[in-house]
Amino acid sequence: MFNEREALRLRLEQLNEAEVKVIREYQIERDKIYAKLRELDRNGSPSEIKKDFRSEKKPDSLPVLAELAAQEIRSYQPQSQQQSVQPQLQSISSLPAGIPDGTTRRRRGTARPGSKAAKLREAAIKTLKRHNAAIKSSELQKEIEKESGLEIPNMTTFMQSLIKMYPEVKKPYRGQYILEGEIESAESANE
């Protein structure tokens, strides 16, 4: 029976999925901006770089949001408290900022390559690639377990995490999954 509690739980899940999607979009845009800034740093003349970028933000300065938060704190505190906060802000500003050159972000909560979850995910992607149409969850679970030799304790949770990691995996109907689009390989995506 579909009651109010179930409806609220379903809405929370939908909100979580929408939030993850928006966060992913922001991360992609932020990565593009950082890449463009690094490219401009490499291609621009040293005098232009100093004028445009370095004078505004030092390499070891706080990220923009942290700087704004520190300014907010300063504006709300009386003068006597500002003196005690100043040493704390200096220690915070010594932390590295932004994404270091040549590195990619790794999503939190992802399993290490070679782990049980990674093997199951790889088997799931291979199985979904073999099927052109939607496949029942129970059939998919049997094929994944047969291919990987590992047991999936909770198929719903496993597939939800797979969908978050690979947006190409879709759930067209209740209890059915399909792979729409291309995924190079599960191994290269985990690196």
UniProtKB/Swiss-Prot annotation:
UniProt keywords, alphabetically: Coiled coil, Cytoplasm, DNA-binding, Repressor, Transcription, Transcription regulation
GO molecular function: DNA binding
Induction: Expression is constant during late log phase and for at least 2 hours in stationary phase (at protein level). Probably repressed by AbrB and SinR, as well as partially by ComK. Probably negatively regulates its own expression. There are 1000-3000 proteins/chromosome in exponential phase grown in minimal medium.
Disruption phenotype: Increased expression of comK, increases transformation about 5-fold, decreases sporulation efficiency about 5-fold. Increased excision of mobile element ICEBs1.
Compositionally biased intervals (Low complexity): 75-96
Principal cellular location given in the protein's record: cytoplasm
Key word Cytoplasm present: yes
Disulphide connectivity of cysteines: none
InterPro entries, per the entry: WH_Rok
Compartment(s) where it occurs, according to its Swiss-Prot or TrEMBL record: Cytoplasm, Nucleoid
Pfam families assigned to the protein according to its UniProt record, in alphabetical order: WH_Rok (PF23159)
Coiled-coil blocks: 2-43
Any one of the GO CC terms: cytoplasm
Region called Disordered, residue ranges: 75-116
DNA-binding as annotated region, ranges: 95-191
Domain notes: The C-terminus (residues 95-191) binds DNA.
Biological function: Repressor of comK, the master regulator of competence development. Overexpression seems to be lethal. Represses at least 20 genes that specify membrane-localized and secreted proteins, including some that encode products with antibiotic activity. Binds to many AT-rich sites in the chromosome, many of which are known or thought to derive from horizontal gene transfer; helps keep mobile element ICEBs1 quiescent in the genome. Binds to its own promoter and is thus probably autoregulatory.
This protein's name: Repressor Rok
Organism: Bacillus subtilis (strain 168)
